């Protein structure tokens, strides 16, 4: 367990599982299953990209290989500051497949917030868009 992590109360977790809200399935396995079940269905779409589940699955594998190639190891924390785009989905699943722990940051966060998140999480890297919302990173 991560230091400082507070789990859901056991009773609520049990109720969520009983209701089917939680299926004790890793997020990455949900994408793998969807890619096998509905390979040609659209998984994610934004203004510039449209990926099927099979495409997103392949892109996530490529991203994971690239992330590992950069020296990111399983358990490493990585700040993710991306807008709501297809690129976010690729990065998130790539990080999960590489075994990294994504630390989500809002696109509006700036140096002070990112520095704080990096310090408290011991993040080793940052995934950021070149530009987002008119801000040049």
Where are the language model's segments positioned?
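Short proline/glycine- and basic residue-enriched helix-capping loop/turn segments at helix->loop/beta transitions
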Residues: 36
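Flexible, non-catalytic linker and terminal segments flanking ANL/adenylate-forming cores
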Residues: 1-24
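Conserved AMP-binding/adenylate-forming core of the ANL superfamily
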Residues: 22-24, 32, 40-85, 89-93, ...
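Structural core segment of the AMP-binding/adenylate-forming
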Residues: 69-70, 93, 97, 101-137
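Generic anion/oxyanion-binding catalytic loop in active/binding sites
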Residues: 16-19, 45, 49, 103-106
